[in-house]
Amino acid sequence: MNHSLKPWNTFGIDHNAQHIVCAEDEQQLLNAWQHATAEGQPVLILGEGSNVLFLEDYRGTVIINRIKGIEIHDEPDAWYLHVGAGENWHRLVKYTLQEGMPGLENLALIPGCVGSSPIQNIGAYGVELQRVCAYVDCVELATGKQVRLTAKECRFGYRDSIFKHEYQDRFAIVAVGLRLPKEWQPVLTYGDLTRLEPTTVTPQQVFNAVCHMRTTKLPDPKVNGNAGSFFKNPVVSAETAKALLSQFPTAPNYPQADGSVKLAAGWLIDQCQLKGMQMGGAAVHRQQALVLINEDNAKSEDVVQLAHHVRQKVGEKFNVWLEPEVRFIGASGEVSAVETIS
């Protein structure tokens, strides 16, 4: 148990794993998984560890997915990209813009790897991965069988997909296929983007605005460890939203296609005067209440205690119960984040 996980999670929480293996191709990944499984060890596959909280030492093998490569197919209607799971997401966004292939600009500066993007159906500023995803290539770990899932088969939801359910722990994502339509249409529904002029705006301007919003509001994990948005924005029924808005008319709310309403978790937390609140080494970020940070050598217990406190305060004030977006990892695998902080 002497391999530190600190460099492999952006929260910078110091726990250990029995083994850590970097896999640069599918075969190395399969070999590492099969070797660990044969020895009866649990296995966790990570990209950049930007959406995990290790609760304790991991009693198994952590495989770091570093499968690289970007292939582009130019079709009359769209650019089709085949991207290795180990590619850095933000570098991919920058690369596509430099090559004149817009469509990912709203998703700039989301931390992590391309392979993690379908698991969470990553999203920001009005765009989710499902908008541009053509397929996801995975490998069945027990058999080595290759499987390609269409976007529909991925069953994307809000921060959700089949990779959090039936495919969890059984399949590893090795590549993601993206479709970027040549008829670019800006999405300017959130934040400072609403100020941009839809008829003249360029993809680069959207990218710059998103980067500006993220860098001014969000902490740099190299300075204060964090995993980005700690909580999901809660999606509530129209009735719940109506009741809440009658009491708090200024609450940001986003009606969804199915009649439900998405609320802004950051606003709810902020209304409870929790910005800057610290427990042990963990704190609520002072600019963006949705982010919990490693202020001062935080232990995982500090983060859990703080998350519990935030959830309680928001629940008591608004009767809305926040759920973590971050994945909680116990000694032998993922555990329920909601149960851990309830």
UniProtKB/Swiss-Prot annotation:
Chain ranges of the FAD-binding PCMH-type domain: 13-183
GO cellular-component term (any): cytosol
Superkingdom of the organism of origin: Bacteria
Keyword Cell cycle listed: yes
InterPro entries assigned: FAD-bd_PCMH (IPR016166), FAD-bd_PCMH-like_sf (IPR036318), FAD-bd_PCMH_sub1 (IPR016167), FAD-bd_PCMH_sub2 (IPR016169), MurB (IPR003170), MurB_C (IPR011601), MurB_C_sf (IPR036635), Oxid_FAD_bind_N (IPR006094)
Gene3D superfamilies membership: 3.30.465.10, UDP-N-acetylenolpyruvoylglucosamine reductase, C-terminal domain, Uridine Diphospho-n-acetylenolpyruvylglucosamine Reductase, domain 2
Biological function: Cell wall formation.
Protein name as catalogued: UDP-N-acetylenolpyruvoylglucosamine reductase
Taxon lineage: Bacteria, Pseudomonadati, Pseudomonadota, Gammaproteobacteria, Enterobacterales
